[in-house]
Structures are given as structure tokens and as C-alpha cells.
Amino acid sequence: MNYPFPGVPSRPSLALLSALACLSLGTQAQTSPPAPSADGSTEVMLAPVTVQDSLAGETATGPVSGFVARRALSATKTDTPLIETPQSISVVTRDQFEAQGVTTLRETTRYTAGINSSYFDNRVDSFKARGGDVSQYQDGLLRTYGTYNNIKVEPYTLERVEFLRGPSSVLYGQGSVGGVLNLTSKRPQAERLREVQIQLGSHGRKQIASDMTGSMDEEGKWLYRLVAVGRDSNTQVDHVKDDRVVIAPSLTYRPSTDTSLTLQALYQKDKSGSITQFFPWQGTRLPSPYGQIPTRTFISEPGWDKYDSENKSFGYLFSHRLSPQWTLRQNLRRTISEVDYRTLYTSFAANAATGRPARPVFDANGRTVQRDAVWQINGGRMLLVDTQLEGLLQTGEVQHQLLAGMDWQRNTSNQSNWRGPGTALDVYNPVYGTFTPPSASRLVRAPNVAQRQLGFYLQDQLRWGPWTATVGLRHDKAKTETEGRPAAAADDSATTKRLGVTYQAGGGWAPYVSYTESFQPLGGVDFYGTPFKPQRGKQLEAGVKWIPEGKGISGYAAVYGLREQNRKTNDPGNPLNSLQLGEVKTQGFEAELIASLARNWDWTLAYAYTDAKISRSNAGDQGQRVASVSRHMASSWLMHRFAAQGRGGWSLGAGLRYIGPQWSGTSAIDTPSSLLADAMVAYDAGDWRLALHANNIGDKVVITQCLSRGDCFYGERRNFLLTATYRY
């Protein structure tokens, strides 16, 4: 991630304790019953389409036992076996969350092939893959709009995370070339669950959480779920909190087997601050006569610095089977977010009198830095709705799973801000209190930005013997308006396509090839008032999947080539501005294996090679590597449960994560590679479980990113997490 220059919308809020309940996902596979065929008709009703996997009861949104999922929703918006999907996709299950001690969204994907989630930031969740950013969705609807007017996701509220690699606009509309990270919320399920969880960890972490679900009546027509989290914690950076309160209720009404309506709501309040300190190159990546800047150093002002956020969302998931062949679905969500963001950071401003360049540097004494200040009150509003009609047909020997859809969204952001000079600070011996905070009357309201998008899409999954073809077409219209700036308005439209073919060769092997496109309207203007052009991407991918029936194994290997136009990047000559590159060309190879083996072994293995270069540019950087992209990434996690039946007893696990060096955009500096180790030990006594996790057990000082504009960022140091879970 290229960390935006401090001062774009955002804000977390105060949060202390909390605990309650949650419920379990109960989405059932919709298998149409056989229907009589009409005599003499060339178009007959499809008997139950063979999209059902050997693992009975598994659905693309429900709980999975172990690490290996066999079905996914993200690639097709239909409940489809992974082996039939002509695109690489990974699923991280709830069981894997718990085994690896996941506490943030970025930790869910750290053992997933090709996605870089090492960025240590309390403000936002960000990911990179295949040389580009990754779009975030939740329950099939866009999750984020803007930058610092969003919240970080609480992983305890999630059932699973799906990562679809590469351009995916045919189904989702706006999206980047890196792929789509789709989060599946915990949903009500019929099987009763009562769970209470207590965590103690490094930096004074104290968290209590609860998850409850079950049926409210004997017929099972009404199901509920309640998830709650309360946390009081510090961080590895002095004076920065990580407090949170989350309450996420949901209610499902199923009057018949044909109809289901799930109401969802979420309230989240975070109280945090800036752990990204924008340190100079010297003292982090480059040597300093006073040594390395301590990772705990806080550049801002205690008592004033904050990133406080509040988020409220509500919506529904509706499904109704119109006939044995046709099903209507509609998903809707409304989100309201508010962020209060205040911080001081190492100054990027040039000073001709002292000779200071326009990047973070030490003063002449080599110890102090000049600081600038920013205060933002950011707000965001999102309204999203996706309506789908799915049908099952057969023409001759070819089975068709049709999907026609229309989605619409309106997203707005507002901001009031203040910027001003700060005071100097000795980073090796900080003394605070020299900065005088501004009053609220100094805040200046910025123009509101609104974006509307309307999309129509059509998809056909054709099955003929061992062959599966997926064909898709979509048209989008997007309009972005900035209040009081008609010249900055942008009307964008695009038609995107998708074609993929899979051949099931037997033994669980399935080679595939696919072509996909992406379209992402950016909206807004650069520092000089020029509207940003929409980003566009195209990808060709070929690979093979190995998902043998009856075995807990899921693996894939793929090669790909993609091109992206109009990518935004930092302007090294003006840290307040963003540039758009002409074209980026990326090619690479990825491989991943996830296995839940006999004798209670769970294993993940992942590798990715990414070669991303600027292929066309007017900025004089044609042929250079894309900044902040590692050519090589690899990881492996191995866990063994010593109990004979996988229930009760001791478990031991350990993992390694490698991220290769990254080009920073200048030959003056790079981001070094890192190799980190994690470990866990747990005891399961049936109703209760006690687990101890250690991340970065070698306590390595990691630099996750250095940028050409002059700053570097630290990663997370060693931390421990003790979790006690009781189910009753």
C-alpha cells in the first residue's frame, strides 16, 4: 500500500469492553428438485445441476469444518464448486482464523498466496496482489469508499474470507486489478451455539467476545444470531490505543423452503490513533549516528492525536425460489460512518532557508524532525443494492446456470479539515507539549463528493460432460460529482467481459483458462484540479486446480498476464498530489495448497512470483518496476492435533512468512525482505479451549514499506495472545 499523505478522510473512536453473542451461518445449498421434461422440447428443465460437492451440507456462505472449503460465491455470485471456477480463488475458513490466532482482517490472508497484507496500520485495512490494490466487499456488496472514512473489520464477526484474484468487474462493477476480497458475515443458523471468549495479550490487550445463534421456534422459521466484541488495548506505539466495541445482530425468517430473509445490522465504535509514523529513511532503512529509531516512538501529541471512528450499517439478504428452475435474490446495505482523525507527522515541506528538501529528514543535529499537523472530520454514506435472477436450463446435452443482475450504489463523502505547522520533536528522546492544538473553529469544510453507479450483468455457466464454460458481460455507468466544482464532474461508462473454460480431467485435476476485465472510476481531481481518469484492466490466466473428492485437499497453480491503465500513485515532486501512470504490465506465477489431512494435520503452502513494470508513461519511468511490489512471496503453516478423533487434547502449530524486497520508486532506497515465524499451542477439552499464539516470535524489526517521497514504515513486533473459549 502507498500510505496516503496524512489527511484524507478517516477516523476510529473510543471503545472499551463489551461482550455478547452471535449466531451461526445457516445458508443452505439451493438444489432444485428434479422436474419433468416436456416431451419433444429442445429446452428442458435442468434436473439437479451437478454443482453439489461430495461434502454434504457445505455451502458457499456457511461454516466449514477444517481449513479446506470446496465451494465459493465470489467468483460467480452463485454457489459454485471451486473446481469449476475458471479463476484462482482462495477461501480462508473460520477454523483457520482460530488456529492462527487472527485478530485483524489483514492477518486472515497472511498465509494466502499472492496477497501482501503486512502493512501495519490502525486506521484502515489494505492489501496488494498481482501488482495492484485489492477491492473489498462484504456479503457481495462494496465495503469501502474513500480512505479515512472507513472502519477496520472485526474478524470475530466473519465466517470466512474469499480472495478472488485478478480483474472481476463483470460481476462487481468497480474494482481494481489486484482482485476482490469478499468477506462473509456470520449469519443465523439452526444449530444452537453459545460461545464466550476472553483474550489477554501484549500491550495490555483485554478483549471479551460472545457469539450466540439458534432457532427461536420449533419449526425453525425464525433464526437469530448475536455477535459482540469489547476490547481495551494499547499498541506497540506509545500513546496509541486500540479500543473497540462491536455489536452485530442478525435475524433470519424462513416461512418455507423457498423463501429466506436475513436482516443484518452492525454497530462499531473504535478508539485509536496513528501507528504509522512517517519516519525518515535515515534511522529506519538507512543508518543514523544515534541508531535506529525505536519502533515504539510516537511522533504526534498525546491527548490530541486520535483516530476515532463510528460505523452503523443495516441491510438484508433476500432469496425466493420462484419455481424449481428460477430463484430471485436481492441484497441491500446502508452504511453510515464518521471519523475524527488528528495527528502530527514528520514534515514533507521544503525549507529553502535551512536547505530542507520536500521529504521527511532530520534537522542538522540528526535527532529532531519538524512536524506538520492535520485534523479531519470525515464522514461517509453508502447505499448499495444488488438484484439477481438465477435460472437452471438445459439445451440438448448442455446445462445452463444463468445469472442476470442489476446493481446500484450511491456513495458520498464529506470532510472538514485543518492543516498547519507543528513543532520540532527529538525522536530519540521525545518531549511533548510544545504543540498548541487548533480550536474547532479552524476547521474548513471541503466540498462533498458523491458517486453513483448503475450496472447490468449477465452470466452463463455452461456444463457439458467434464467441460465447464463461464461467460459474462456487464455494462456500467458511473457519475462522480464534487460539490461546487462542475468542471470536476466525471461521467464514466464501460462494458467489461469475461470468458473462462475448465476441464475436469479426473482425479480432482482441472486445468482452466480465463480472460477477465476490470473498471474502476476514481472520481475527484488531483492537486491541480484535473479529474482522474477511470482505471481499466485486462487479464489472461491459465492454471490447474487439484481438489480430489473425498479428500481434504485444495490446491492450484496459475500463470497470468495483466495490463492496467491509469493507476494512481504518489507524486514524488508533490506529496499532496497523485499521478496516474500510463500503463502497468504485470505477469506472474502463483501456487497454493491447503490440506486437512488424516491423523489431524492441517497444512498450507503458498508461493507467488510477481513481475510488475511500468510499460507506458509520460513521467520518464517507463520500464521501471512498480513500487511496493515484492517479486517473491512465500508462506507455510503446519498444525497437528494430537487427539485421536480431532476433538480434545493438545495442538501445536507453526508458520513461516517471507516477503521479498520491494522497489521504492527510487534507486536511493528499497524496502528490505522479511522472514517471520509464528507459533501456537492449544488445549481443547471439548466445551472449552485454551490457546497461546505468538507472532513474529523472533521479534524482528521489520520495515514493511519505504517510499520515494522519503518515508518508511515499521511492521509489527513480537506479540503474544492468550485466548480462552467456552462453548455451552
Residue ranges and their predicted role:
Residues 156-159, 170-249, 253-259, 312, ...:
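Outer-membrane beta-barrel translocator/receptor signature
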Residues 231-235, 248-254, 258-321, 339-380, ...:
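Acidic/polar loop-and-plug regions of large Gram-negative outer-membrane beta-barrel proteins
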